[in-house]
From Swiss-Prot:
Membrane-protein topology: Multi-pass membrane protein
GO MF annotation: an example: G protein-coupled receptor activity
Ranges that cross the membrane: 22-42, 151-171, 195-215, 245-265, 280-300
Domain of life according to the entry: Eukaryota
Protein name: Serpentine receptor class alpha-25
Species the sequence originates in: Caenorhabditis elegans
Family: Belongs to the nematode receptor-like protein sra family.
Location within or outside the cell: Membrane
Length: 335
């Protein structure tokens, strides 16, 4: 009776060959390398946000929370992959001990999917943070804690809601070869992937529009205003919107590769051998790659922005002596 509900306990020859193959072990090395690099750059990015922050306080807070979440997600992914590789060595000749029962994966699934969804919906928080900043800057800069806290709460609700739809109440039956694979009786994952994609596409459209408006506004301010504060705010707004735009596009590309890459090879499962399918699937860990992109963009964008600021200051002081003289010249040229 249990076998009818759970499915076969013993791995088929194709799954055994795939899980003990060199390509799957290479995929583990690639994923482990990406994860350790993400740990290293997450530390650098957190230090950059705390010591040399180039973002608004609201954006900074959202990015810090997302970085901490990415560390938890990477740790969960690493633990799952180590567990899988360990079994592939120890039980290579015992197919009935190679697979994981759903009950063995419950804790890993909880952390993996919650942090996965939280990472996905970070695009929502970052997009609306920029949107509010552009359309209501006075409210935004006076209520930054309220804005960031509200957006993070919505992000959490979206993550828990998606987890509830996908995994809550799923019967604890079935076997999988890697613990983050979709449980046997979880039937809503295709709908979840579609919903996540819609959210991300919507956010990409909105943030590109906000970035366009920020660039246009900054050019107008550079032409019509000689207020250092106003010009500085416009420049910083463009830089932040550009960084968020890059983050969202990279996040979308990585998650699209994961969600639809796996769905695509599943749709072709009947056309390929079971061994080929289980050999290819471990490479499609999109959120793992996205969790490396996040600290990379924050860290290198911070360094680039600081360098550009120094260059601008050096040009101003070398050409016009001091900032006061420079602003007087600008004022005369605009009169």
């Amino acid at each position: 009776m249990n076998e009818l509900i759970d499915g076969p306990k013993c791995a088929s020859e194709g799954i055994v060959n795939a899980m003990t193959s060199i390509p799957v072990k290479i995929s583990f090395l690639i994923i482990a390398t990406v994860i350790f690099l993400s740990f290293y750059f997450a530390r650098l990015a957190i230090l950059a946000l705390l010591r040399n922050n180039i973002f608004s306080n609201s954006t900074q807070r959202i990015l810090l929370v997302c970085l901490v979440n990415s560390v938890f997600h990477q740790a969960a992914t690493l633990e799952i992959r180590i567990h899988q590789v360990y079994r592939s060595f120890v039980y290579a000749s015992d197919p009935c001990s190679l697979l994981f029962h759903f009950t063995e994966c419950e804790v890993e699934l909880y952390f993996y999917y919650l942090t996965n969804y939280f990472s996905t919906y970070s695009v929502f928080s970052l997009t609306f943070d920029r949107l509010i900043s552009h359309y209501n800057p006075r409210f935004y800069f006076s209520q930054q804690n309220f804005v960031s806290n509200t957006l993070l709460i919505i992000q959490c609700l979206l993550s828990f809601g998606t987890y509830y739809v996908g995994l809550y109440g799923v019967p604890p039956f079935g076997y999988v070869s890697i613990c983050y694979y979709t449980p046997k009786y979880a039937v809503n994952f295709l709908k979840i992937n579609d919903f996540r994609t819609v959210v991300m596409v919507f956010c990409i459209i909105v943030i590109i529009f906000v970035y366009y408006l920020s660039v246009r506004s900054e050019k107008q301010i550079q032409r019509t205003s000689y207020s250092p504060g106003e010009r500085y705010w416009a420049y910083e707004n463009v830089e932040t919107s550009q960084s968020v735009c890059i983050l969202i596009v990279l996040q979308f590309a990585c998650i699209l590769m994961s969600s639809y890459g796996v769905n695509y090879i599943r749709s072709k499962e009947s056309m390929m051998s079971e061994e080929d399918f289980h050999t290819l699937a471990p490479f499609f860990a999109g959120v793992t790659y996205a969790s490396l992109c996040l600290p990379l963009v924050i860290y290198f964008k911070t360094k680039l922005t600081i360098r550009n600021r120094r260059i601008r200051i050096a040009v101003m002081t070398s050409m016009y002596g001091d900032v006061g003289d420079h602003m007087n010249r600008l004022k005369k040229s605009w009169e």
